[in-house]
């Protein structure tokens, strides 16, 4: 997952998830932010990742599995408006937390 970063916006009633590609020291958006559970963010990310040229199937599986784990973690901890960022980072080292509201 070193080539990809998952970005989240942690909200009380939703979690927004997007995927960026890491090239050198720069991040380039691969997907829009999708809000779970407002929409089926996992399915929307899958559709966008399917349309990405040059994205290997194994990388897509790793990304989507990580998204599943992040959504599960959010569901278990959504009562926490401000998650413990060091704990979040220890569970998901490739995650970028864009904000907590």
UniProtKB/Swiss-Prot annotation:
Biological process, per Gene Ontology: translation
Keyword Electron transport belongs to the record: no
Molecular-function annotations in GO: structural constituent of ribosome
Entry-linked InterPro entries: PSRP-3/Ycf65_sf, Ribosomal_PSRP3/Ycf65
Principal subcellular localisation of the protein: plastid
Self-association state and partner proteins as the record states: Part of the 30S ribosomal subunit.
Family, as annotated: Belongs to the chloroplast-specific ribosomal protein cS23 family.
Entry protein name: Small ribosomal subunit protein cS23
Organism for this UniProt entry: Cyanidium caldarium
